[in-house]
Amino acid sequence: MKKLSLYISLLCLILTAGACKNKTGGPATASSELTDDALMDTVQHRTFLYFWEGAEPNSGLAPERYHVDGVYPQNDANVVTSGGSGFGIMAILAGIDRGYVTREEGLARMERIVSFLEKADRFHGAYPHWWYGDTGKVKPFGQKDNGGDLVETAFLMQGLLAVHQYYINGNEKEKALAARIDQIWKDVDWNWYRNGDQNVLYWHWSPTYGWEMDFPIHGYNECMIMYILAAASPTHGVPAAVYHDGWAQNGAIVSPHKVEGIELHLCYQGTEAGPLFWAQYSFLGLDPVGLKDEYCPSYFHEMRNLTLVNRAYCIRNPKHYKGFGPNCWGLTASYSVDGYAAHSPNEQDDKGVISPTAALSSIVYTPEYSMQVMRHLYNICLLYTSPSPRDRSV
């Protein structure tokens, strides 16, 4: 289970919070004195603590944003995120298994989360992107985005399904929690989000604006898990044509090409090679190893190559940013000086922001290269005595 815990905890890494202290809160040790296992355990433990100690108190879910100074100009400290909470749930699950908290403490937290989700706003079974954590009422993500968000729901569901599998054969309280999660899973009406039985899934539906957001989802991007879960639903499963016609665009998703001299097989929406969260989010719950279909001969190798493209671009560093290199690479969605941006390996979308989550969460694809970045960032943290390298991308 340790291997699985490492996979979940590092791949769902949103930030390496508190990495400049050891587990007892004392001064940290230089990374050169730590084994790889010890350094990774430090990162895992502090990642767990972000979601465990930093959770919104009522819901137990992950806050949409974290401000170090505690000042929230938009008065949104209590806003929680559905997709990010799916990642956090998996990090907590790994922490339970590794003994960071007791199994009983972990179960109590999961019960709090599920109790909130059972009562929180849903729209044909799908959750919104944001809620107010104290009330469970939807917090609009945008003017017309005040209803169901099927992509964020999928990210949340893969976390909940991991919890379901963890507890399904446990004691009576654990089995009861698994049964409640099973009902939440069965309540999601994936078919509704076909907007009239079209062979494609739509990102949003609003009780006020209906389908006005008008966002049918095609691959490839971060949304593959949504199509997989929609097809797998035991109650509202979509036909195979939705995957083939919608996600795969009748085969147009296949587009062999090279970027940075590295072969890619898929068509990436709007770019030659997407940000690294496209290689990560869908594969928190879906193992890419051995995964293939008629459009991609190996999803693991495709995502590994997408990661290597990102690294190669950062090393080439065509915009000559200070600090980019073999020990400091990784472009993905995160904050920048101009707000949120989906940083990608091309000159238009490269704003000079290295997000720690990008390379560290790629450790399942590039273990040696990701460890180089982990040690580099850890030592920077010691040098400047900042609380941690951190990123919020959801």
Q: What do the predicted segments below correspond to?
A:
Residues 28-386, 390-394:
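Ser/Thr/Asn(+Pro)-rich, low-complexity disordered segments
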Residues 13-14:
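Sec-dependent, cleavable N-terminal signal peptides
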Residues 18-19:
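C-terminal motif of bacterial Sec signal peptides marking the signal peptidase cleavage site
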